[in-house]
Amino acid sequence: MSEKRDPYEGVADVYDQMAADPELQQFYLYWRRLLLQSISERGLKVRTLVDLMCGTGNSTIPWTRRAGWSIVGVDGSAAMLRQARKKSDRVHWSCQDIRKLRLEVRAEAATCHFDALNHVLSPEELQQVFHRVADILHPGGLFLFDISTENWFRWLHEREKLYTIGKNYMMSSNRYDPKSRIAEFRQLWFIPRGRVYEKRLVQVRERPYTTSEIRKMARTSGFRVLTVKQQWVLEGKPVRLAFVLEKKPPRQPKHC
């Protein structure tokens, strides 16, 4: 995660168009079902839901249809949130780095989708994120997120692909270093502006995390792991895992 320039400036509207992809729509549906199932199983009454690293809000806005729910969308990209605000004024949008997450409200549920947590490049910083999320949740609150595994980054290594998104084109190239465990994604966008195409380069880095690493971070931050699911399997190997965590209640003092 970088605190320098916004890598999505100039392409946020195109990223928003990608949400129309049928495969992505299936992911959104999967996450909604998993969270609602988890809420039902725990008998949780949700008043506030926080969607972290929400991008242009495609995973956030559908929750505004839930009666009695207050929805908060958090992202570090001002460009992404400008696009999100155009689509809904029923979400409380907040531009901030989730490593330093601060909210005035506490929530019963928090979500973070599309391997967004893989953008946090060190275990120390990801542990910090877990602490911050625990701080904004009520005891018994749920944290649902997904993580891409190393299998995914190894599979993507040195693969290139040309995508067509509406009238836009994007050439994607990927590199993964197993020693540093850092993946580099380079996206060259060609966006029509009148009679010409404007080129935009987006470069982001990600890092895989193991199930054992996530479990340890969860425990350290006061969570218990309720569910780990293989959300996506490629060539017989899990490439994306879905986690459901529950914030533990505070320990009661022992009476003599």
Task: List each language-model region with its residue ranges.
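Conserved class I S-adenosyl-L-methionine
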Residues: 1-44
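A short His-aromatic
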Residues: 118-120
